[in-house]
Amino acid sequence: MPAIQPPLYLTFLLLILLYRIITLYVWVVSTITYKTAVRHAALYQRSLFRWSFDHSL
């Protein structure tokens, strides 16, 4: 029984660690993507506003 116990525990621990890493990676990627998207949207909106303002004059 003790021969089976440590590998099972290690596998479980590794699974938790892997899950944490994946969750963290997904969170970081989504945060960066969101921030970049917001920044690009703001820049695009600003340039579009400036373009329309320049052309209206």
Swiss-Prot record:
Topological domain spans for side Intravirion: 30-57
Topological type in the membrane: Single-pass membrane protein
Gene Ontology terms: biological process: symbiont-mediated suppression of host NF-kappaB cascade
Record's subcellular location: Virion membrane; Host cell membrane
Predominant cellular place of this UniProt entry's protein: virion
Lineage top rank: taxon: Viruses
Record's protein name: Small hydrophobic protein
Organism annotation: Mumps virus (strain Belfast) (MuV)
